[in-house]
Amino acid sequence: MKLRFISSALAAALFAATGSYAAVVDGGTIHFEGELVNAACSVNTDSADQVVTLGQYRTDIFNAVGNTSALIPFTIQLNDCDPVVAANAAVAFSGQADAINDNLLAIASSTNTTTATGVGIEILDNTSAILKPDGNSFSTNQNLIPGTNVLHFSARYKGTGTSASAGQANADATFIMRYE
């Protein structure tokens, strides 16, 4: 009986010893990003990095300079606004300007697919004012209220010639905020 108990205890100790072995290996790196701002509002995370889908259009729509696609709305949300710090907010966009019409964003060359030609992307504010992508053309000021504020914009394709060619028609722009 005593031998059986010792054998059972020894077996249990061996199982416990093998089950407690742990290996420590490198798992990777996590990069945390953020920013503290001394401003009237903070830009909502979803607004800081967004995709505006302009859609798919036939090339024959752009058979004259200035022809446009449908306006596609998008917003920039501001959080934790304090109108005592600043009463108004405005936005300016910056990106590669179209070579023919510098009021438009240039269509970026695509490495894996064909790039569309004959159009650029026009950005407008909530008053339909065109926002040149130069980082200096600010939207109309919007009065800030305490808390959350939503700034409204729209974008569309605009013809730069008398014809367009099919392909990807993408562009990137950054934006800056001005508080007054």
From Swiss-Prot:
Q: Which SUPFAM superfamilies match?
A: Bacterial adhesins
User: Does Secreted count among this protein's keywords?
Assistant: no
A Gene Ontology BP annotation from the UniProt entry: cell adhesion
Pfam families, alphabetized: Fimbrial (PF00419)
Query: Any keyword Iron?
Result: no
Family of this protein: Belongs to the fimbrial protein family.
Q: What else is known?
A: The operon is cryptic under classical laboratory conditions, but is functional when constitutively expressed.
**What the protein does?**
Part of the sfmACDHF fimbrial operon. Could contribute to adhesion to various surfaces in specific environmental niches. Increases adhesion to eukaryotic T24 bladder epithelial cells in the absence of fim genes.
What is the protein named?
A: Uncharacterized fimbrial-like protein SfmA
The organism of origin for this protein: Escherichia coli (strain K12)
